[in-house]
A protein has these predicted regions:
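Selective detector of the "anchor" transmembrane alpha-helix that sits immediately C-terminal
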Residues: 61-64, 141-160
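Interfacial loop at the N-terminal end of multi-pass membrane proteins
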Residues: 2-82, 107-131
Length: 163
């Protein structure tokens, strides 16, 4: 039973981190393939990012539940799961911020700039703000990935509870 629960925890983290690692590859391929139609590529990537965030939040809830219950089930010592739990909470908070803060603001800026950022005036305040938010979004996703990798390391070295 302990092996199954640990496996589920690692699976939740793998799904989230795998998606975080794979997303930039998909985005790059999408923009390369649809180069003349960057608006369509951006729409596709935006939808994929929403899916990534949904997967991340579900994976985060599963990981958080397993980490919280791990000491009671004898998987880990109570103190050894505190840091991984905090990181998962921060990862989920960053995901929520990106999904419900950054993405809607980028969409508003895109629409206010005329619907297609690549054809809008680069000095337009909406275009400037869109690009600023896009840069922030990239940093948030990188932060989520790095916190996820740290979580994996901390979970891997977490002390086991009594058998």
């Amino acid at each position: 039973m302990k092996t199954l629960l640990r496996t589920l925890l690692y699976l939740a983290l793998i799904v989230w981190l795998g998606a975080e690692i794979f997303f930039p590859v998909v985005a790059a391929v999408t923009f390369t393939t649809l180069q003349p139609q960057t608006h369509i590529a951006g729409t596709i990537v935006g939808q994929l990012l929403r899916i990534l965030h949904g997967m991340g939040l579900v994976s985060g809830m599963v990981a958080l539940a397993l980490l919280a219950l791990g000491p009671a089930w004898g998987l880990y010592k109570p103190r050894s799961v505190l840091a991984p739990m905090a990181l998962v909470i921060f990862m989920m908070a960053a995901t929520v911020y990106s999904q419900f803060g950054i993405i809607p603001a980028m969409e508003r800026d895109r629409m206010a700039a005329g619907g297609a950022i690549d054809t809008s005036d680069p000095t337009n305040p909406n275009t400037i703000d869109f690009n600023r938010l896009h840069n922030r979004s990239e940093h948030v996703e990188l932060t989520i990935l790095l916190m996820g990798l740290a979580t994996v390391v901390l979970v891997a070295r977490a002390e086991s509870g009594k058998s």
